[in-house]
């Protein structure tokens, strides 16, 4: 099975902590956010249970590549970055369509998302991707 975990850089308080660590020389730019790290870890647990591959995917500007690399460092098998300036200005429904297209392109069986900035608890983007693919959406799962 192929599990795709979507990642992005840390935001809000996580950025403040990441900036402090970067100034101390402990991490570089594009730090993986804690929620997305949990999404990658969930995908890794699924891979351990069912076999297959974990792909860390980002739909973001190139500076997010650091987050993709961190996802690989914690156990993702490979990473993919889809960077296009037109996507940066897209609304959440369009981003959901892009996520669905990327999931299809990668041959994903399951997509794992963390909350998306500007999204109401992440449900708009996830639901849009699920609707395009005809997949069920399980928002805010507490365990797998």
Model-identified regions with their sequence ranges:
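N-terminal glycine-rich FAD/FM-binding segment characteristic of electron-transfer flavoproteins
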Residues: 1-144
């Amino acid at each position: 099975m192929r599990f795709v975990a979507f990642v992005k850089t840390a935001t809000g308080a996580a950025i403040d902590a990441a900036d402090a660590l970067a100034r101390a020389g402990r991490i570089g730019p594009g730090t993986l956010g804690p929620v997305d790290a949990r999404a990658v870890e969930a995908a890794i647990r699924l891979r351990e249970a069912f076999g297959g591959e974990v792909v860390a995917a980002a739909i973001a500007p190139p500076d997010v590549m650091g987050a993709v690399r961190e996802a690989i460092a914690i156990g993702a098998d490979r990473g993919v970055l889809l960077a296009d300036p037109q996507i940066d200005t897209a609304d959440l429904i369009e981003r959901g369509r892009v996520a669905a297209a990327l999931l299809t392109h990668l041959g994903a069986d399951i997509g794992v998302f963390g909350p998306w900035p500007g999204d109401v608890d992440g449900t708009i983007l996830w639901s849009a991707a699920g609707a395009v693919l005809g997949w069920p959406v399980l928002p805010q799962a507490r365990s797998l």
